Amino acid sequence: SLKGDANLRYGPTTDANIIYRYQHKGYPMEILRETDGWRYVKDPQDGVEGWMRSFLFSGKRYAITKSEPFSYGYDNTKKNQILVKLDPGVHTSIKNCDSKWCRLKMTLEDEELDFWVEKKNLFGVYSNEIIN
């Protein structure tokens, strides 16, 4: 995920034209390949690809809710009680993921929320990815 503001470029050099300017700390990007301090990445929401400097990425994992009408955040233990209804495009921190669900964390109106969302409703994590 991005540490902060970042430019997506057509080539792996600061002289290359800028495709898009990201201004979202924690925005998840899919890393397709790396070379000499640069990463060729794909935006998981719209599929745009380009180059970014490697130092612009943090080791923290974030997700974005997909453009379904909304996603549900479920209770931590039973995954059957709805705790929160999430609009499309909500950024959340990933705590961990099992084979089908991701445990997410976010703050809403000064309240810390901890809940589960099905992977199929998230950008920023692969369907077969396990995160501990």
Which residues does each predicted region cover?
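Short N-terminal segments immediately surrounding and downstream of signal-peptide cleavage
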Residues: 1-9
